[in-house]
Amino acid sequence: MSYPSQGHYLPPEHQYLTAATLASHGHEHLYAHSQLSDSPPRQDLAQRKRPKYTRSKTGCLTCRMKKIKCDETKPTCARCTHGQRECTWPDASSPRRRAPLRRGSIDDRPSTAGSSVSDDSSPSIRNSTPPRRFQMDSPESGLLPPPSARRNMDPFLQLPPVVAPESRHQHIRPRPPPFTPPQSEQHNLTLSPDPSEYCRYDRYDATYAQTHHLHSSHSSPSSRAPHMVTGIRGMGYSPESVHQWNSPPLLSPIESSSYQHYPLQERGMVGPSDNHHFRYQ
């Protein structure tokens, strides 16, 4: 029995690998062949494309309109001759015209400087004009502004001065002067009191006399008179002082008038006060 040689015998795994490698090598070979076959047309397309030209600012007007680069050959450039177009060039005198304009603008500056110098030299004339106006407005010249101008100027001339806040409070709240009654009123107070006070004192004296007479008639003067006096007059009065204020119920008109005026004069000399009225109420 004969066995195959080891060189020709391959296990199945190796056979599979070899097939895969052959297939991959075959695909690579085909891809490279396709690239080689496709490369010449691409190069032809790159050669066929027109070159990109930049815009020229110094070329002819026709190339500027077409936005192509001009070789600036005169009288006709190569682009215009190749495309059979009319080659037009801008006038050469236009830049020369711009230069005189610029020079003229520069030449105009000294004139403005001269005018500024003349303006600087004129302040003496300008400063001399306001005194003339004041002279015309002065009363000595006899020429016064019209009344409408005066009315417009009056509110500014007659404005009140600005007042500080402290002085404003002083203006708003002036301090009242000390009251000094005239001498005639003082004499009237001492000599002749107000007639309304006569009525008050008469009424109080009459009511007090009546109440004291009733109490003295019902009870003895030694037992109840001190209590009544302390209740009405206060703690500083005694029964002896009560008899000074008592008056008989029936008196002649002359005696009653003299009795009424005597205490009123003393009260007027002391001065009017409302404190002694509360004890009767």
From Swiss-Prot:
Give the PANTHER family listed for this entry. Answer: TRANSCRIPTIONAL ACTIVATOR PROTEIN UGA3 (PTHR37534:SF7)
Q: Example GO biological process term?
A: positive regulation of transcription by RNA polymerase II
Q: Which residues bind DNA?
A: 60-87
> What does this gene product do?
Transcription factor that acts as a negative regulator of basidioma development via repressing the expression of genes involved in basidioma development, including hydrophobins such as Hyd-1 and Hyd-8, lectins such as JRL1, as well as the fruiting body differentiation gene FVFD16.
- Protein name per Swiss-Prot or TrEMBL: Transcription factor lfc1
For this protein, the record's CDD domains field holds: GAL4 (cd00067)
Question: Disruption effect?
Answer: Does not affect hyphal vegetative growth but promotes basidioma development and shortens cultivation time. Significantly increases basidioma length and number.
The record lists the organism as: Flammulina velutipes
Ordered alphabetically, the record's keywords are: DNA-binding, Metal-binding, Nucleus, Transcription, Transcription regulation
- For the keyword DNA repair, the answer is no
Q: Which Gene3D superfamilies match?
A: Zn(2)-C6 fungal-type DNA-binding domain
